[in-house]
Amino acid sequence: SLRNAAKDCLKIKETNPSAIEFVDKSTLKNFDFKFKKNTDCLLFVEYDSDIEKNKNNLKNFADGQIAKISKSRKEIEKWWKFRDLALSYSLKSIKQEDRIPHIIEDATVPLEKLGNLFSIIEKLNKKFHTNTVMYGHAGNGNIHVRIISNRKKIKILDEISKTYFEQIIELGGTITGEHGDGIARSRFIKNQYGPTNYQLFKKIKEFFDPEEILNPGKITKPRRFSTLEKV
């Protein structure tokens, strides 16, 4: 399960891997490998040394099963290409009419809270009758989430994003780990950094850009995410 995979990530991290990456089951059908039918997700774990030792460690403590051990450069590159194409695969798996804006795109939590992040997504899907595609950098708790829902239900994004970000912040996480805030997430910046820091951001912006020329409508003077009205 996703939560068991999150627990495994904590143990794997202690073995000093060079990478721990994650994709959920929605992308597995795109790879030329026969996964077991009950596979919920896949962790890509890479080591630079002590391969046999770490392989045995994983067998001893991992809840999931080792699907494949790759040592040749060609085969390793094949698996990493699959991971790198997760975004493309995720889009292919979503029907055009079920593609809605990605506001809760790449939140990040402390690794020990990764299971909580998956639980939050599970509850939101149940409450709003949505589905999700997830992939990301499990080793540092950074998970990319794409909501699947009919565009006619786009207004639910407001409540989903508000609930999700509030709970991510409560876990000690950040609403975006890689992609920045932009128009989509700027209205949540004050919640992330607090009123004192937010006022400081505004003063810095007013000092260097009093005419609002650079990136207007972002971070300190957020405007409503226009896609919500137009899609």
Walk through the language-model features, giving the residues of each.
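Noncatalytic alpha-helical scaffold of FAD-dependent oxidoreductases
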Residues: 1-231
